[in-house]
From Swiss-Prot:
Location of the protein in the cell: Cell membrane
Pfam families: Ras
Stated name of the protein: Ras-related protein RABC2b
Lipidation (S-geranylgeranyl cysteine): C202, C203
Binding-site positions, GTP: 20-27, 67-71, 127-130, 157-158
UniProt keyword annotation of Cell membrane present: yes
Taxonomic superkingdom: Eukaryota
InterPro entries: P-loop_NTPase, Rab, Sigma_54_int_dom_ATP-bd_1, Small_GTP-bd, Small_GTPase
Bilayer topology: Lipid-anchor
A GO term for molecular function: GTPase activity
Amino acid sequence: MGSSSGQSGYDLSFKILLIGDSGVGKSSLLLSFISSSVEDLAPTIGVDFKIKQMKVRGKRLKLTIWDTAGQEKFRTLTSSYFRGSQGIILVYDVTKRETFLNLADIWAKEIELYSTNHDCIKMLVGNKVDRESERKVSREEGMALAKDLNCLFHECSARTRENVNGCFEELALKIMEVPSLLEEGSSSVKRKPDYRAHQGRCCSS
């Protein structure tokens, strides 16, 4: 469920999904948020997840953050993890334009196909802004695409940790503002069948 008693150590539990091409820094972004260390990581095989507890506006939050593989061969495996997500972060590499273009061409369509929460909060995140001299996607382009896809927008650097916390904190805040997401809960094990699964889509085109 989305809420919990004090015995569990948190008030609200959210499921957040990280998606995007392989190599854009999804795993590094997650590691940077979870801990203070950042490493050069091998591509994720299938799906991994981490749990982070934080306090936002007086509420104790438990974030279960799923890190999905970006390679096409894992696409069918990761599609099931869209189910029940209250927040989805679409990550691209500001130094690789193809990863940006694929957000609309591939990843937004994946959300439309597989997400069961039509009210889920989406965020576009441009990673690797520490490599400014290699930038191939302007901030203005990122903001424009985010507007087109009805997403929040941030740029950050997993390596320097610049604005990493800000991304997750704003996403959590926006989820907290949507009553249907709080009622939905984030547990795919204990949830009731989602009768709305075919009635709404999370991502507008």
